[in-house]
């Protein structure tokens, strides 16, 4: 009986390790109101994979464009791998191709035709052994929208702490 519990716990730990977050763009959720998200694959070279698995990716200034019917990721910094020579290492800010179905790209193109919408990378994560990136269609927030969102977030936090205090 105890062995079954150990096996289940080990399987749950393996699933959690197989779906872990590698990089997160927390600033994007502050600067943009995310309307829709999409999980895509990303075309990488070997040293980029090693750097991402070591947690050396920065999504903060990144954005996505649709060019020639392809999704492209721009301005995302993936540090060069520390144990690779300069000859084999990659360019940290190179443009990377995102892998999505044609109908998903067409749907995104239709949404981006609306004024004020942008494609923003939200996070890089593992799904099994594959590296995936979640992108979001976002509408830029004005300063007063950011302040209102911060005020609402603060009030929810205070309510939660008050509820926890009296329970």
Swiss-Prot record:
Top-rank taxon: Bacteria
InterPro entries: SmpB, SsrA-bd_prot, SsrA-bd_prot_CS
Compositionally biased spans, kind Basic and acidic residues: 146-160
Subcellular location: Cytoplasm
PROSITE patterns given in the database record: SSRP
Keyword Ligase: no
Region of interest called Disordered, as start-end residue ranges on this chain: 144-167
Keyword annotations from UniProtKB, A to Z: Cytoplasm, RNA-binding
GO annotations of cellular component type: cytosol
Recorded GO MF terms: RNA binding
Cited SUPFAM superfamilies: Small protein B (SmpB)
Any one Pfam family match given in the protein's UniProt record, by short name: SmpB
GO biological process, one term: trans-translation
Keyword RNA-binding: yes
Function statement: Required for rescue of stalled ribosomes mediated by trans-translation. Binds to transfer-messenger RNA (tmRNA), required for stable association of tmRNA with ribosomes. tmRNA and SmpB together mimic tRNA shape, replacing the anticodon stem-loop with SmpB. tmRNA is encoded by the ssrA gene; the 2 termini fold to resemble tRNA(Ala) and it encodes a 'tag peptide', a short internal open reading frame. During trans-translation Ala-aminoacylated tmRNA acts like a tRNA, entering the A-site of stalled ribosomes, displacing the stalled mRNA.
HAMAP family: SmpB (MF_00023)
Family affiliation: Belongs to the SmpB family.
Name of the protein in its database record: SsrA-binding protein
Organism in which the protein naturally occurs: Synechococcus sp. (strain CC9902)
